[in-house]
Swiss-Prot record:
Keyword RNA-binding: yes
HAMAP family, per the entry: eIF_2_alpha (MF_00231)
Record has GTP-binding as a keyword: no
SUPFAM superfamilies cross-referenced by the UniProt entry: eIF-2-alpha, C-terminal domain (SSF110993), eIF2alpha middle domain-like (SSF116742), Nucleic acid-binding proteins (SSF50249)
Limits of the S1 motif domain: 15-86
Keyword terms: Initiation factor, Protein biosynthesis, RNA-binding
Species per Swiss-Prot/TrEMBL record: Methanothermobacter thermautotrophicus (strain ATCC 29096 / DSM 1053 / JCM 10044 / NBRC 100330 / Delta H)
Protein's job: eIF-2 functions in the early steps of protein synthesis by forming a ternary complex with GTP and initiator tRNA.
Protein name, per record: Translation initiation factor 2 subunit alpha
Amino acid sequence: MFFMVRRKNEWPEEGELVVGTVHKVLNYGAFATLEEYPGKEAFIHISEVSSGWVKNIRDFVRENQKIVARVLRVNPRKGHVDVSMKRIREDQRTKKIQAWKIEQKAEKFLELAARDLGKDLDTAYEEVGYELMDIFGDLYGAFETAAEEGEKSLIEEGVPEDWAAVITEVAKRNITPPEVQITGYVDIKSYAPNGVEIIRKALKSAQDEGITVQAVGAPRYRLIVKSTDYLKAEKQLKEAAQKCIEIVEKEGGEGEFLRELT
């Protein structure tokens, strides 16, 4: 099923980047439906198709082609939107398409959340969708926040509790929080006859907690923690380092935790 990501405003603004699908190509220009503005179309004059000379417009645009264009003029009274394909850098074009695709995914999430409440997508937009876009910048940002921080983060922003609950449920089911990796170091020394075994035991205590241990050069060892929660990763790193140090110190050795090397 195709999802049309919507904007709160009925018409785009001048200077805005829009995504369109070309549906008609003529000798003097092309028409494209605006994917984010239901029922609206834009006109691309042949002079705005490419920065180079355009002998045949069909060498640059074709029916059903997805395009990114910059809005030049908007006339709601006449129903006209004029856009340019040439007044965009390639990196802007790429970012816009990527953002649009992500928002398509978020709109699917919104529909799933609405379904859990027995509502349709139109109702979802009116009751909470546009509000989420105002608060978080876009729909996906709202679902990402819900996945990472829970429904309380939505409720605190004024999102109704019933919507916050289903949005969070859908978000946690479909979005994996990005993984972070943090690194710390322990310098541990043992003066006991069985010092090697003591050091090995200390480092194994960190490995048993799921931490990667790497030798930098005795007496220094690198501890690496991976997690989807930065604060939990920091806590895990410090606790593991402290445990290593305690094991060594208990046997008459010494140790030090270094969060960063200077």
